Amino acid sequence: MKITRFWKHFLASACIIGILASGLPAYAAASPAQAAPEALELCNAAATPESVISLINQIGTVTRNRRPAIVAALNAYNQLDDASKAQVSNFSILAEAQQILGIQDALAKLSVNYDKVDADWSISTPYVDKSINRKNSGIYPWIYVSENATNICMNVMFHYIGSRRIDLKQILVRAGDEKYTFDCDTSYDGGYDASLKAWFDIEAFTMEPDEISWFGEWLSQPEVIARFIGWDSTTFDYTLTAPNRQGLSDVIDAYNLLNAATLEVRVKALRNL
């Protein structure tokens, strides 16, 4: 769905300026020696349901700084047999901590801006600024989380930068055998950037739920080409670069984790970055 002119400017400015409870391999690989002294003492002893419960209670508010405490609790829990695991009455806290930490790790790769007045978050890839400074065109997905994390909206911004003025009419994305069409409105949201000595135009779109899978389809292809088409039929082809691909992948990973989480988990992850 095409974004209105107001939202296009909002999106452009923001861009420019499920891990499951059963597993956390990256965290489990860390050394328990990183944990707090009291947690380390419990780790060095043979794990019991009681010691695991104690370790879980030490996790507290989940932030990335609490990773050692989460790792210590998880490592101890994994030492238990199934019967003993069933006696860990507060395992749900550990499971939630893993999920929150997974979301926070994904968001750590991105630019996250929180608006205290509107209580919303804008999440984008830091690759945007680097790309623009290098006068590169790009495809930039962008997440908007609003109403105290109740709503999650996925958007995509197409940014043309080049030596010719192009008032965009349409954008075609070719990925493998599939072609995706984005029709632009008649307003011109571009101009000439004197510092870059280049022309630019921006078009942003809100993705419908059934369209979000397009990003995965694009990433599955070795080559993705966006054709920028002007109202005067001028065209410019942009091939997705490796950094742009990584930025797109990072945003999609974060979106999938946020979308799969409960509202409570989502709020905790976002408010404790």
For every predicted segment, state its role.
Residues K2-A14:
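Bacterial N-terminal signal peptides that target proteins for export
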Residues C15-G23:
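Hydrophobic core
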Residues A36-Q104:
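Beta-rich interaction/scaffold domains
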Residues G23, Y27-A30, Q99-L273:
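A generic "folded-domain core" signal
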Residues P32-Q34:
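Intrinsically disordered, low-complexity terminal tails and inter-domain linkers enriched
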